[in-house]
Amino acid sequence: LARWQYHFENGSTEAVLNALSYYQNDDGGFGHALEADSWNPKSSPIQTWTATEILREINFTDNTHTIIKGILHYLESEKSFDGKCWYKLVKSNNEYPHALWWHTEIDSTDNMDYNPTACLAGFMIRFAEKNSELYNRGCFIAKEAVNQLLADERENGMHTITCYLRLMQYIEEAKAADIIDLAAVKARLSGLIHCCITQETTEWETSYVCKPSQFFDCPGSVFYADNQKAADFECDFIARTQLDDGSWNITWDWDDYPSQWAISKNWWKANGIILNLLYLQGFGKL
């Protein structure tokens, strides 16, 4: 609700931060179903990444604020970190209602998947004190992540590609272009994003697919030109597929915990409403 009010009803940044703070644990990490497909109250890298996305959505960059300081403290503590990557999957998820894809028998990076590590490294570079130990660790992780990306060592899905995109954006915002080869990263991401977007638009309404809004929400994006047809189509698609209750269809399902999934599904619907309207707004359609 605070996010909606911020974007569309002149709501305050403070209201969003206050709501977000209830999901933050004493260790600085986030839990409590902020990412609504896992009800694990304990801190995890994925839930903490979700918090960074909300901060980015409201353009909040004050690194003296307790929320950002807490996140940096959590990352510095190296909880759920194997020395190279933060765990994408944490075993404590199993103790609470969750989607099948968050179930795991061991804490795992999912075979060195840089989701959410690339984004978290970028967050460190953007908000830690420059040349601090934490900043330098973020730089090291970023270089390792980019090496994997450019070496094409693994197939990266849309969520991992988005984490690399965030890494690039954070580095640009930190004016730290010397850390990685930004031009090479941008070129690689351009190709990956185009290939990742589901061009068969008949699948969009009923399948869990990748749409342009996964990566950008306005024509000013450097990735718009190569994906203009699909991006413009998405505006029409959003307008055409709104349900009678004002929301949009959720194209995935937990296949377990039906009572909790019914609640999480509504949380996802609320999130989808905000993101869809922001996309239309970015394209001048509101």
Where are these regions (language model features)?
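Preference for long, amphipathic alpha-helical scaffolds in soluble/luminal domains
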Residues: 1-286
